[in-house]
Amino acid sequence: MPLFTEAPKSLCILRLSAVGDVCHALAVVQHIQEYYPQTEMTWIVGKTEMGLLSSIPNITLIPYDKKTGWKGVLSLWKQLKNKQFDALLNMQTAFRASILSLGIKAKFKIGFGEKRSREGQWLFVNRRIRDPFSPHVLDGFMAFAEYIGVPKAEPKWELAISQDDYKFADQFIDFSRKNLLISPCSSKAEKDWLIEGYAEVANIAHQHNINVIFCSSPAKRELEIVEKITALCHFTPTNIAGKTNLKQLTALISKVDLVLSPDSGPAHIATTQGTPVIGLYAYHNPLRTAPYNNLDNVVSVYEENAQKEFGKPSSELPWATKLKGKNLMTEIQVEPVIGQMKKLGLF
């Protein structure tokens, strides 16, 4: 029996970060909106991620900056002090999110099921979803919608990207040939692939007359990595590292033919735009974290390393098992990456 048999008047979504997970959450939010169009929706989201979601219709977005500490928590509580929700969907297990939830008034506070709940989230909720059979994060999020009475459906996304964003992207696209976007950096250095690997792939793509574009955030580490990669290229690729905001990046991703990326936000943005993406994985199970509609395109060494570390297949390991080996991403070879590019018709 679902929690609601008719549309709730108001819902609050709590998912702060990161960009990829916010993309997953957006599919859930828009699915709920489609089924319950009269329900008033409020989403508490991270300050950075807000840049991707702004201007989406029929939802109130409240940004939270984790750098503000308790001051930010109290400010958020003050904004919501006169607001009462039918339910809070707490889609983030981080303790910080649970603390934020204390100041959100809702009859039902819904959290993850036993297998996916972490950092004591169960102490802050009064309802828990059923863990889905599928290990993917997005399916876990979709279980929140099902719990409140929204039938299952394939995820869809509609981001509010402006014509100015698309015009910005156009200046980097070569419309006379195919375009490859390489986003080489993850949020943690251990999840990055080899600089030499990216450079070799870029050189091979260039030999096949592909327009190669590099992107990254403005973070110093990421800018330095892109600089090192491009220094090994036998041509001059288009380098827009640190030069785009999230919406401009989304516009660019929507126009390229393929994205190559480790576990990162741009990989999941590609899924929202229907752009094929090759994800590179070693430390996290790609069946859980890879771009949702591109699981078949993954190049991964996770399974064999899980067998080495635990002596059993990943299907028998706890849901969020992260491997501990050193430099596992170095085991990813160039050949299977090129093989995926050929399979996807890049050349």
From Swiss-Prot:
The keyword Transferase applies. GO terms for molecular function: ADP-heptose-lipopolysaccharide heptosyltransferase activity; lipopolysaccharide heptosyltransferase activity. Keywords: Glycosyltransferase, Lipopolysaccharide biosynthesis, Transferase. Pathway: Bacterial outer membrane biogenesis; LPS core biosynthesis. InterPro entries: Glyco_trans_9 (IPR002201), LPS_LOS_Heptosyltrfase (IPR051199). Belongs to the glycosyltransferase 9 family. The keyword Transferase applies. One of its GO terms (cellular component) is cytosol. Transmembrane segments: none annotated. Signal peptide: none annotated. It comes from Haemophilus influenzae (strain ATCC 51907 / DSM 11121 / KW20 / Rd). Catalyzes heptose transfer to the lipopolysaccharide core. It transfers the first L-glycero-D-manno-heptose to the phosphorylated 3-deoxy-alpha-D-manno-octulosonic acid (Kdo-P) of the inner core. Disulfide bonds: none annotated. GO terms for biological process: lipopolysaccharide core region biosynthetic process. Its EC number is 2.-.-.-. CDD domains: GT9_LPS_heptosyltransferase. This is Lipopolysaccharide core heptosyltransferase OpsX. The gene is opsX.
